[in-house]
Structure formats: C-alpha cells, structure tokens
Amino acid sequence: MGKQLRNQRHRALMAAVASTRIRAGLTQRDLAARLGRAHSFVGKVESGERQLNVLEFCELADALKVSATVLLSKVLRG
C-alpha cells in the first residue's frame, strides 16, 4: 500500500474535515493553531497525505468544536 491511502472512506474523511473547518470559518492555520501543530499538518490531513489515528481524530473534532461522533457520521455517509 502506498504512502497515501485513497479509499472512499479516507476521501470522505478528508472532505468532512475540510468542509467542517470551512463552515466554522477557520483557515488551515487557524485549525492548526487550535491543535498546537504546524499548519502543514492540517493541509496534509485534508490532502490525504497524512492519516489520523483515533486520538488525533478526536482532538481534531474538539478543535473544530464538533463531536467526534458527528464528524465520524459525515465520514460514514460519504
């Protein structure tokens, strides 16, 4: 398997993160600041270059001020 996972659910995750961030009025830099990470982290997550573990997913949801359950439901709906 290559460096970038490009299955349907991973693409749905990338889209859910980006759309939720944009709907919240945040830039990638804003979200990265909330996470205490470099802005490239958010860009890599949204582009599919970086996968998230479950704890990072929960931290991301918290930073977006949505529940992890809501964010996950967006991913599962595709």
Q: What is each model feature region?
A:
Residues 17, 31-32, 42-45, 71:
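Conserved hydrophobic/aromatic packing and binding residues within compact polymer-binding modules
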Residues 55-70:
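DNA major-groove recognition helix of helix-turn-helix/homeodomain DNA-binding modules
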Residues 23, 49-52, 63:
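Helix-turn-helix/winged-helix DNA-binding modules
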Residues 35-52:
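Recognition helix of helix-turn-helix/homeodomain-like DNA-binding domains
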Residues 70-78:
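Short amphipathic recognition helices of helix-turn-helix/homeodomain-type DNA-binding modules
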